[in-house]
Amino acid sequence: MQSRMQGQRTLQLRQNSCIQPKWISQKNFTFGAATSAYQVEGAAHRALNGWDYFTHRYPERVSDRSIGDLACNSYDLYKDDVKLLKRMNVQAYRFSIAWSRVLPKGRLIGGVDENGITYYNNLINELKANGIEPFVTIFHWDVPQDFRRRIWRLLKPTYSDFKNYAELLFQRFGDRVKFWITLNQPYSLAVKGYGDGQYPPGRCTDCEFGGDSGTEPYIVGHHELLAHMEAVSLYRKRYQKFQGGKIGTTLIGRWFIPLNETNDLDKAAAKREFDFSVLGSTGVRTISKDNERLGDRLPKFTPKQSALLKGSLDFLGLNYYVTRYATYRPPPMPTQHSVLTDSGVTIGFERNGVSIGVKASINFDVKDLRHLVDFFLFVELLLLSTRIPSDSKSHQKQELLMLIANALADNGRIQFQCSHLSCLKCAIEDGCNVAGYFAWSLMDNYEFGNGYTLRFDMNWVNFTNPADRREKASGKWFSRFIAK
């Protein structure tokens, strides 16, 4: 049996190691690109969601005070999106359904917006006509605003409403959609929305909207997992057999290295932070002391719920962004409990003044992607989002002062992609069950709290005229790589 930490052999990260004609021999490996509804569609012809309210009412929560009302205008330009995908030679497109576009009130009782259904039918049909497989995320953080008010910001159970919403999608699109992702990064919504207040609804212990950073993130995360479980159970009972699809979820994928690799406290801290921020999103706690650490603040699953949750993945998606150093930090006083400090770990990007990896909008050490993949050795994995570092931050006003040619010549992204694909090649050759690689993102888009200041993507977009889209060097390289 292979060890989940077996990847000790030297990784060859030369650029030419990932451009060979036959990159892997594994059958049914999928290359794709990804987006999400709020980040690309625009707000036209749908009801408000929590991000609409949040960015309009509190623009200071976004780094450039921008809003996602237009974004890439994919609602009107979806055929252009598909043309980009076709030009890139990808076999799949991961996108999300905007909950408020199909259920304006968030609930079936509030009525179905057939125009929204038509939009997604058109998108799915266009993808299929071009030989591109749709991978659909059911929920990517955009709770309908009317629904959010009624359920008190996800702090009350919403399983039946989410299940009904998911069933609507299974009914209307399941004849063509064969890959369903219930939730995108449940950890992020729970922590950013209820731990530090940076995402809607902006709740935390010290936030003006109120909240409790020591309890609410765990309640929300618990409800997210139960909603996932209910949707999976429904799909398997009523739809999977005759529709022939698969269903899973997506976690934020991070790896942690002890700041001092000879210090036992730092070693334990790295393991514990992984447990909190990655495994915690699956309902799994591998260190019993963590349950003791959280006590009654951690909601409990019934034995039946635990059993259903344990078997609720046909595949697991990982969004890999970052590697960080971890060092021991004493736990907070009982009166200062917070999801941000409960793990008793301080994380950072530098050791003795040296960055852990490439300095960009994110920091990464590419070899640690291999460790992350190894950890989930016996699960079918889809690497659903690898954020390609932005060469620079560029506010849309500043773009008038820069040459578009510089933005398009993103050679750093090419090396980033190449290094990650080299690691995946090693992992697959050693038996890791990695079934796909999806680059984030198809095109420059609205990056939630960062607004339009970051460009992670393989196609340049003019945010004042989203029909103006231009292929970057990384997009051309990715296209050639897939075609070989």
Swiss-Prot record:
Binding site for a beta-D-glucoside: Q39, H140, N184, Q185, Y321, W440, E447, F448, F456
GO annotation, biological process: carbohydrate metabolic process
Gene Ontology MF annotations: beta-glucosidase activity; thioglucosidase activity
Disulfide feature: C204-C207
EC number assigned by the record: 3.2.1.147
Residues listed as glycosylation sites in the UniProt record: N28, N260, N462
Pfam family, one: Glyco_hydro_1
Catalysed reaction, written as an equation: a thioglucoside + H2O = a sugar + a thiol
Enzyme class: hydrolase
SUPFAM superfamilies: (Trans)glycosidases
Keywords annotated in UniProt: Disulfide bond, Glycoprotein, Glycosidase, Hydrolase
InterPro entries: Glyco_hydro_1 (IPR001360), Glyco_hydro_1_N_CS (IPR033132), Glycoside_hydrolase_SF (IPR017853)
Similarity comment: Belongs to the glycosyl hydrolase 1 family.
Protein name: Putative myrosinase 6
Organism: Arabidopsis thaliana
